[in-house]
Amino acid sequence: VPESARKLAAACWPGPLTMIFEKTNAVPLETTGGLTSVAVRYPSNKVANALILAGGGFIAAPSANTSGRPSPTKAEHVIEDLGDKIDCIIDGGDAEIGLESTIVDFTEEIPTILRPGYYNKEMLEKVLGTVRVDPGILAEDSHVRPKAPGMRYKHYAPKADLTIIQGEMERVIPEINRLAAEQEKAGKKVGVICTDETREQYTTGDIKSIGLRAEDETIAHHLFAILRDFDEDGVEVIYSEA
């Protein structure tokens, strides 16, 4: 384990950070999908940590969701995805953060972000200095494949078509109202994602506030839960403030 990874662990663990290292012979290939590297995470949830300690300090397990759906943030979401495929669920309460962990690859000379998450590039650079972002994440060319499997295909997406409207709010709000009204007139069920400050200015659709605009952690906490609520309600088109 490189010293840079130890510094990052001291700053960010326990928390939503996954680090990738070259595995040793102590790590079975069955737990890495045959790869020579292994992803390690130390969660902040007390129930998860109690389970890990009960298991001897290490647990190898996949994520509690099916590919292509918004990430689960509560036990009910796991039941929806995996209810008939698993024997039990240990409910540790709602996810505190609500976003995926940031994945950082330490098998390269320069630490590389393979999946964006709660910890962004600027946060990591304060600890590590230089940090790269996997070119496959940024590439508009679909032939450039991200290194992390979870970034290669459609993941974390709602069933509805989602459009994010950017710009000054005095233009964004009427534009979303116009688009939502058009879709409703066409027979579509519409959802709108906004912030507390603008909630009362929307007139059409299933309107959900994601929190105060300046509170990034609140917005992160609510994002996937709102997308799943829209799925459950049969929403077909979603418009969101940026």
PLM region spans:
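Active-site-adjacent structural elements in enzyme catalytic cores
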Residues: V1-A242
